[in-house]
Amino acid sequence: MKNSGSIQESTSSTGISVLIVLALGFLMATLDVTVVNVAMADMKNTLSMSLSGVTWVVDGYILTFASLLLAGGALADRFGSKTIYILGLAVFVMASCLCAASINGQMLIAGRLIQGIGAALFMPSSLSLLAASYLDERARARMFGLWAALVSAASALGPFIGGVLVQLAGWQSIFLINVPIGAAALISAYRILSRVPGKSSRVNIIGHLLGMMALGFLSYALIQGPSAGWRSPVILVAFTAAVLAFVLFLLREISAKTPILPASLYKNGRFSAAQFIGFLLNFALFGGMFMLSLFLQEAGGASSFMAGVELLPMMAVFVIGNLLFARLANRFEAGQLMFVSMAVSCIIALLLFVLISPDFPYWQLAVLMSVMNLCTGITVPAMTTVIMQAAGQRHTNIAGAALNANRQIGALVGVAITGVIIHLSATWYAGAGFAFLMMGAAYSLAALLVWLFLAAHNGTAASEKM
């Protein structure tokens, strides 16, 4: 694949190289979410940070990342996916150096905010570049499965890798490891990725500012709500501002000559349904894993290290699910795989709602959660495939950005609501039961959406050209 050439169907070896290059960026972004969790205590003590301050080390990254994803997709459309991907990687690596060199909490939080900006730039572009490298829909689906497997492996191993790095070289090492990974990704991206020319259309600056404000205020309210109190003035103002900004964003989208999400995407039932399924998936997944990490320690008596060990098999099956999708994609439509996976997840979540009790053994919990997460591992690349097919080649950047934004907001909402459920429950077992019920409701709604909008289209062409 030539550096300046147009996108053509990838050869097998070149296609795998593209996959690895793009996965390196996702690897860094994913690791920096999971490894930070195990380093928070060391950061807090070394930099004399408050609990609220160290929380922002995690949440500040999510705030800028979620708020700027749509803008990242639009910039990739305007200036080219490869250009914005490389720019985002460079920003992320420099921000990692800033984090590692931090001498106080404010400097570390600033570095994390900038890391979120970099991730918001390169993550939408990576999906677009991967989609463009595989024009054959079956091959593209397989590559989405392999790509998701690499990312899932990073998520599963993140806490373990972070613990080893912190133990051997201090918390700074979890950021310094991004330097060699980022350098390899930058050099490889420049040499291997094809140049994707930008479009001459203007960037809807006002629309993006309103979208950023809506996502930013919503993210802030969800992040700060548990500590500040959901009825506190600052949280109520943030929610109100988010709603107002979202309404203005919709009005701007209707009237703008160059809307952020083209009207054809809004009207595409497959695209819209898959986007909402992405929200529901992360809502259930992150809410559930947040609950389990606390449940295993508070109700099960596990240490933080042992809780991580007990969660590992439940997380590792994501990789198996991703790889399984890559094999099943040749035989079944993405919508079929999504429906079966979501239906099974719903049944398991409702079963756990009934069974969870002090007498319920860990091994049964681990088996059921592993099957549920295996289904999620199948669903994620299937959902990505559906969205990229429905968006068409013209809109892959903004489609990928919208998917990532919806999933980030889903994760924030899921964790926030799960926290409220646990807080209001009389016991940890009651809280876990209601959390599983919430997950079952989300998975059932996702399965219904798949049945109505995706599975019914198996006999039609998989792609809807825009």
From Swiss-Prot:
Topology relative to the membrane: Multi-pass membrane protein
Membrane-spanning segments: 16-36, 56-76, 83-103, 113-133, 146-166, 168-188, 203-223, 234-254, 276-296, 305-325, 337-357, 367-387, 409-429, 434-454
Recorded GO MF terms: transmembrane transporter activity
GO biological processes: response to antibiotic
GO CC, alphabetical: membrane; plasma membrane
InterPro entries found in the cross-reference section: EmrB-like, MFS, MFS_dom, MFS_trans_sf
Keyword Cell membrane: yes
CDD domains named among the record's database cross-references: MFS_MMR_MDR_like (cd17321)
UniProt xrefs under Gene3D superfamilies: MFS general substrate transporter like domains, Multidrug resistance protein D
Protein family per UniProt: Belongs to the major facilitator superfamily. EmrB family.
Family annotation (NCBIfam families): efflux_EmrB
Protein name: Methylenomycin A resistance protein
Species this chain originates from: Bacillus subtilis (strain 168)
UniProt lineage: Bacteria, Bacillati, Bacillota, Bacilli, Bacillales
